[in-house]
């Protein structure tokens, strides 16, 4: 995959996002911030859009059983890029949804109320997989973001990249918002853009320091450090399903995944364009192997979402 001009990419993404929000007369951009690289890059894009349009970026960190390092980085990102940022714990919302599921299925027979149960008890009672429970967490977060957007007359920003889309590595009604600035970028390109932004903010901080603009210097230092901290995190879905995204996919690196997908997709599109029958298992077997093949077949080729239908 060829190296992109990330300065140009960033400017194009900012312009397209600004055009969308202004042409639709939206009053706010609402973004869920996990601390991961995707939401961090989208936050940086929306921050620039906000500077150009005066449309505020409203960020929320919505922890549910999150790891401490993810939570701390989400705060760095939110405080660096958002016009309004808040941490709001949705553990009670998740627990209430589990309780309602159990009650609806007739699994709660002792007339005990919501407060009598631990989350782990309710998860066990449903008999659902960790993936299914992870999807419920994602949907709790998305519902909250859409409620905020409704009140503020805004839209919810998506944070899915092309790699996740092609693999089906997303949750229906849990990940996809109204507008996605990075949907055409592979995961490796998201990292490339993040590295460009980190260096860009660092350079601006040094320039401000040289000119004795301390407040401006501190602002850009915070932005650079937020992006740096996000890049250092091991990518996870934030749902507690596995230790990392790559572990779920069955790959050693995103370079490997993006290389496979970028070779497979033109092959698939050529067959479809020329009206030839598509034999997905045969074609994928040519290009993939092991767990990555199974993951891609179950997600991308099934036209579903890997988290949803398992």
What are these regions (language model features)?
Residues 1-31, 41, 45-48, 53-58, ...:
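ATP/NTP-dependent adenylation/nucleotidyl-transfer catalytic domains that generate, transfer
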Residues 36:
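Conserved G/P- and acidic residue-centered "switch" motifs that form tight phosphate/ATP-binding loops
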């Amino acid at each position: 995959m060829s190296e992109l001009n990330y300065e140009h990419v960033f400017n194009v993404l900012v312009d397209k996002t600004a055009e969308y929000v202004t042409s639709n007369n939206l009053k706010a951009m609402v973004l869920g911030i996990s601390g991961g690289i995707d939401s961090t890059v989208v936050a940086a894009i929306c921050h620039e859009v906000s500077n150009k349009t005066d449309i505020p970026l409203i960020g929320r960190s919505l922890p549910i059983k999150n790891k401490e390092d993810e939570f701390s980085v989400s705060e760095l990102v939110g405080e660096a890029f958002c016009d309004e940022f808040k941490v709001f714990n949705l553990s009670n919302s998740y627990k209430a949804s589990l309780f309602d599921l159990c009650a609806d299925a007739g699994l709660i027979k002792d007339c005990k109320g919501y407060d009598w149960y631990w989350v782990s008890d309710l998860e066990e009672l449903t008999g659902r997989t960790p993936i299914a429970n992870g999807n419920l967490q994602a949907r709790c977060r998305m519902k909250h973001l859409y409620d905020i957007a409704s009140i503020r007359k805004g839209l919810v920003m998506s944070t899915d990249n092309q790699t996740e889309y092609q693999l089906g590595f997303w949750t229906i009604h849990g990940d996809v918002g109204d507008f996605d600035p990075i949907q055409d970028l592979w995961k490796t390109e998201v990292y490339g853009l993040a590295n460009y932004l980190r260096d860009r903010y660092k350079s601006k901080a040094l320039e401000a320091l040289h000119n004795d603009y301390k407040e401006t210097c501190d602002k850009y230092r915070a932005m650079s450090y937020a992006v740096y901290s996000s890049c250092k995190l091991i990518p996870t879905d934030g749902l507690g399903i596995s230790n990392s995204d790559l572990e779920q996919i069955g790959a050693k690196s995103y370079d490997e995944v993006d290389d496979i997908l970028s070779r497979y997709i033109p092959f698939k599109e050529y067959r479809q364009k020329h009206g030839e029958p598509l034999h997905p298992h045969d074609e994928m077997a040519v290009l993939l192997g092991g767990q990555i093949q199974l993951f891609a077949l179950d997600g991308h080729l099934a036209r579903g979402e890997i988290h949803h239908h398992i």
